[in-house]
Amino acid sequence: AYLGGRMNYFSGNYTGYVTTRLKSNDASLLDIELDCDQTGWGITPIFGLDYKIGRWNIGAKYEMRTLLNIENTTEKNSDPEGALSDFKDGVNTPNDIPAMLSIATSYRFTDRLRASVEYHFYDDKHAGMANIPGTNIGKQHALTHGTNEYLAGAEFDLNKTVTVSAGIQRTDYGLSNNYESDTSFSCDSYSIGFGGAIKLLPKLTMNIAYFWTNYSDYTKAVEASSTGGYNGTTLAGTNVYSRTNKVFGLGFDYKF
């Protein structure tokens, strides 16, 4: 059994600008600029259990919700009362780390080959978030469900010095149009990773890994409306949210 906690500190920055014009009449659609630093901190209580029997190892961990408010220090905000209202100087915005349940099991096939499967659930719908643009409703209420993650991996000892590994991960968010916005969005994904460990010395091990994530595009269509439409133009429009992620990691473990 395990009982502990984690101290979290966040420091980030939004810097950029957007200029958009309509082709039909060259009218300005959007012209905004932002330079904002954000900081915040919180403490996460953690509970864990681990049970070993024969070649099996079963574990579970629960991280409680972390109350986290992000404070803005804003140098430039061209639309503080509109699209960029969440980035006003001095404003504190809820940005909780959701409660998380993790359940995993691993099996040792031989002394050299091991494999594991794991499930994570993030209770996003009960974590405080920034408001849906133009409302006083937190974005967490726009989600259809919390985040589900499914993972599997294996590692094999080539010899007493070198270990290789591989794994996959599937992430499923409960996304909706009201949750996705131009300044904050998510995309469902699956990931594939490969890695290795080399024992350089009896107490020193080097770890190396490559991680690639393929994200599913999220398409948000807005219907024409005399009182709104796409970005206030009254016209119909579509946003496609997409991202890419490729990570290379290198680390060292030393046993004292």
Predicted regions and their residues:
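Outer-membrane beta-barrel porins/channels
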Residues: 1-256
